[in-house]
């Protein structure tokens, strides 16, 4: 897999191994060859993610993770499976970009009483599923996406994040 990892915040020492593990597990679950996928991941702080959230979502507040899919793969029908990424015969298929904020992740993990590594892994899986066309706005889509997240995290030995809330 091609992972373009940018660490803007020095506290993100755990991000490289977590990203490799979470992305590999997600792509495997989705039946995608990691060697044919390209993802950009930004490890930042709350100030940076607040600016990104304001710019792209018009929400000037911190959030845990943001994603920008390279192409719209969303299913047309509620609860439907998104389209598969189109193969790129010249190299890796760019799936999109993910940004994740250390401060918010740490706060949320502490509040939930779970290890930050587990929470960050969940958020990387979550962000990557967004790049692959999954969403959680409609109830049927949320059920599908959360089920995939739970299955992928279970394969990594991480408890269901939705039963810990």
Swiss-Prot record:
Q: Fetch the InterPro entries from UniProt.
A: MetalPrtase_cat_dom_sf_prd, YbeY, YbeY_CS
The superkingdom of the source organism is: Bacteria
State the needed cofactors, names only: Zn(2+)
Q: Where are the transmembrane segments?
A: none
EC number assigned by the record: 3.1.-.-
One BP term from GO: rRNA processing
What Pfam families is this protein classified in? YbeY (PF02130)
Q: Does the keyword Ribosomal protein apply?
A: no
Cofactor detail note: Binds 1 zinc ion.
* A cellular-component GO term for this protein: cytoplasm
Q: Which residues form a coiled coil?
A: none
Kindly give the Gene3D superfamilies that the UniProt entry links to this protein.
Answer: Metalloproteases ('zincins'), catalytic domain
Binding, Zn(2+): 126, 130, 136
Extract one GO molecular function annotation from the record. metalloendopeptidase activity
Please provide the record's keywords in A-Z order.
Cytoplasm, Endonuclease, Hydrolase, Metal-binding, Nuclease, Plasmid, Ribosome biogenesis, rRNA processing, Zinc
Its annotated compartments are: Cytoplasm
Carries keyword Zinc? yes
Enzyme category, top tier:
hydrolase
Instruction: Give the record's family classification.
Output: Belongs to the endoribonuclease YbeY family.
Protein task: Single strand-specific metallo-endoribonuclease involved in late-stage 70S ribosome quality control and in maturation of the 3' terminus of the 16S rRNA.
**Protein name in the entry:** Endoribonuclease YbeY
Q: State the organism named in the record.
A: Ruegeria pomeroyi (strain ATCC 700808 / DSM 15171 / DSS-3) (Silicibacter pomeroyi)
Provide the taxonomic classification.
Answer: Bacteria, Pseudomonadati, Pseudomonadota, Alphaproteobacteria, Rhodobacterales
